[in-house]
Design a protein with these regions (language model features):
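ATP-dependent phospho-/nucleotidyl transfer catalytic cores
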Residues: 77, 84-91, 103, 150-158, ...
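Conserved beta3 strand of the Hanks-type protein kinase catalytic N-lobe
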Residues: 133-134, 276
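Short, amphipathic alpha-helical segments that act as regulatory/interfacial helices
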Residues: 25, 58-62, 161-164, 201-204, ...
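Hydrophobic residue at the +6 position relative to the catalytic HRD Asp in the kinase catalytic loop
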Residues: 279-283
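Glycine-rich ATP phosphate-binding loop
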Residues: 132, 138-146
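Helix-rich C-lobe and terminal helical cap/extension of kinase-like folds
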Residues: 5-14, 38-48, 71, 224, ...
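A short, charged helix-loop
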Residues: 32, 142, 373-376
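N-terminal accessory/targeting segments that precede structured cores
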Residues: 1-129, 136, 154-176, 381, ...
Length: 453
């Protein structure tokens, strides 16, 4: 535990900037030396050092690193692999921080509001930590945001922009401007726990008809913009669950429940939970899914969802004109025939399990490196034709698909993904999704500015 990180001061912010600048500038300098001076860089060694440096930093940079590790070739392979290893359960902050945070948010005598309060965090992540407590004789979870995260976001994202800009000079395959903008907006939203409380209500509304998912309920009188109190959900994390050696039937059931938990909101309401990180869900004894952490969600335009479905149909039918239309709906601009053919290679990998009407694993080859190797080939082809600029929407959509694919591979699930998918899209219309999305946003009190984003 560490209390020394309670630094809501100018000095603390300067130390933060200095630490992040040192870490990211070191990466930038090494990449520049490799590209412009012919200096041979031991990427594996330096990537490991980078992970260790970022792992010691609480806050958004660690979250950004986890996201970047799932975007094909946003960073060199060696760095992506090391950043993927960043753990959500970083060391928690101690009782001094907890007392200060709770008092500043709930006032003097905050302890009297609870029947009991566990001083030790039960989990810690990049932006905050969670404590167990009892309220009105019910078990609750309380998420406390780490200090000075708003300043940390500005420091981290400014330094990330430096690395992105330099990497683009070295490698022109991917333009990262919109990726940076998307990460910035989503991270700002994650710091607003009142917004997350509304997101939680949104998911409770959208998944009310799904019997195989359990969602916490926010407790408004014990929540602010920096602490979020919610009902407790009980379950096992994925890796612990797999240690129990569940049957193939049970693993398949968990996979189906996960698929519906993620994609019913998307295909019915145009909303995605963009963070299928191992710490954000657990598995009940009855195989239901506990979904947690609602900071990283995105509301899409209905025609974007239509574009996702149209791209599936284009790949299925070999319809190039429909593919052009679909990529346009995604937000890709100025793609020529060759660029679309290259993107279709990656799309074919992502959509592959949905295109085959049979029971199969999510990836026929169990080797988890296959997707990255394929992405590498796509990357080289994109670089050859001058590169593309992925739209903002791509970031969380791709992260969800790749992250869920990893979950299904861990489960070794064998499911008819085609039928699961068609069960959600066969009656799809833009008008019906727009109506459901509007009603859901209004029902929970989220800003209507989200509509049509």
């Amino acid at each position: 535990m560490v209390d020394s990180e309670w630094r809501p001061s100018i000095g603390g912010r300067l130390r933060r900037y200095a630490q992040v600048t040192s870490t990211m500038s070191g990466l930038a300098a090494r990449l520049a030396g490799e590209r412009y001076l012919g200096i041979e860089l031991d990427r594996g060694k330096h990537a490991n050092q980078l992970r260790e440096a970022l792992g010691s930093l609480k806050g958004p940079l660690m979250k950004v690193a986890q996201i970047l590790s799932t975007i094909p070739d946003a960073l060199p392979k060696e760095y992506a692999e090391e950043l993927a290893a960043l753990q959500a359960d970083a060391p928690s902050m101690g009782w001094l921080f907890v007392k200060r945070r709770m008092r500043s948010e709930l006032g003097e005598g905050w302890e009297d509001k609870f029947d009991s309060f566990n001083k030790k965090a039960c989990s810690a992540a990049s932006l905050g930590q969670v404590h167990e407590a009892s309220y009105n004789n019910e078990k609750v979870a309380i998420k406390l945001q780490y200090p000075d995260m708003d300043s940390a976001i500005n420091a981290d994202l400014n330094q990330l922009k430096l690395v992105f800009s330099l990497y683009e000079r070295i490698d022109s395959a991917i333009s990262t401007k919109d990726i940076h903008s998307e990460l910035s907006d989503r991270l700002q939203e994650e710091l607003d726990y009142q917004r997350e409380s509304l997101n939680m209500k949104l998911y409770r509304f959208m998944l009310a008809g799904e019997n195989e998912v359990v969602l916490p309920e926010p407790i408004e009188e014990l929540s602010t913009s920096r602490i979020l109190t919610m009902s407790w959900v009980e379950g096992q994390k994925l890796m612990k669950y797999l240690e129990t050696e569940p049957s193939q039937k049970d693993r398949n059931k968990v996979a189906i429940n996960m698929f519906r938990t993620w994609y019913v909101p998307f295909y019915y309401y145009g909303v995605i939970h963009g963070d299928p990180h191992l710490g954000n869900y657990s598995i009940c004894e009855n195989l239901k899914i506990n979904l947690m952490d609602f900071g990283s969600i995105r509301v899409f335009r209905p025609d974007f969802v239509g574009g996702v479905i149209d791209l599936y149909r284009a790949l299925r039918d070999g319809d190039n004109e429909l593919a052009v239309h679909a990529y346009s709906q995604w937000g890709f601009d100025g793609l020529d025939k060759e660029a679309i053919e290259i993107l279709n290679i990656w799309a074919g990998f992502i959509y592959g399990p949905l295109l085959e009407d049979r029971i199969r694993p999510i990836q026929e080859l169990r080797d988890g490196n296959y997707g990255r190797e394929l992405a590498g080939k796509v990357h080289e082809e994109l670089k050859r034709i001058g590169g593309i600029k992925p739209p903002r929407e791509f970031v969380l959509m791709d992260r969800a698909a790749v992250g869920l694919g990893s979950v299904f591979m861990h489960l070794k699930a064998e499911v008819n993904w085609h039928q699961l998918f068609h069960g959600m899209i066969d009656d799809f219309t833009l008008e019906a999704l727009q109506t459901r999305q509007t009603n859901a946003i209004r029902e929970v009190g989220l800003s209507e500015s989200l509509l049509g984003v």
